[in-house]
């Protein structure tokens, strides 16, 4: 459970501009995954690392930082797929889709989000699926 709480503590630092602190907490969470072998949250850790990377001050104009974030999102996707963790896969896909759309790759973003969204047959009233639907509609407009 500690990894779970560290993940969301790290994520919480992003919106208040404390990115370095968030990344430090995330490093602690990733170290726990390594030391314990409990990797249930690993995909989400990579996704959060990508989100925090995009909040670094130099991220806006630095394509290397944005490529780094994309790499973390793709790592999150790979881990989620290996674990058959569809909820983590959805979250990682949404993060990646937003980044791709910002760089003119809307068709790619829409296609990958539509694929994972289409997998779900229930739970459409959950926050993640509602957010995915909104994003999918935006990408389709």
Residue spans of the language-model regions?
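Helix-coil-helix junctions within alpha-helical repeat/solenoid scaffolds
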Residues: 1-141
């Amino acid at each position: 459970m500690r990894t779970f709480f560290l993940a969301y503590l790290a994520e919480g630092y992003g919106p208040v501009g404390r990115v370095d602190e968030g990344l430090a907490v995330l490093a602690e969470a990733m170290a726990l995954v390594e030391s314990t072998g409990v990797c249930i949250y690993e995909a989400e850790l990579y996704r959060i690392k990508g989100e925090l990377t995009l909040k670094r001050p130099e991220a806006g104009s630095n394509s290397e930082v944005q490529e780094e974030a994309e790499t973390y999102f793709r790592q999150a996707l790979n881990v989620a797929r290996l674990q058959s963790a569809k909820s983590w896969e959805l979250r990682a896909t949404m993060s990646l889709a937003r980044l791709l759309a910002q760089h003119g790759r809307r068709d790619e973003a829409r296609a990958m989000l539509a694929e994972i969204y289409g997998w779900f047959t229930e739970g459409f009233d959950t926050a993640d699926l509602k957010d995915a639907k909104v994003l999918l509609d935006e990408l389709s407009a």
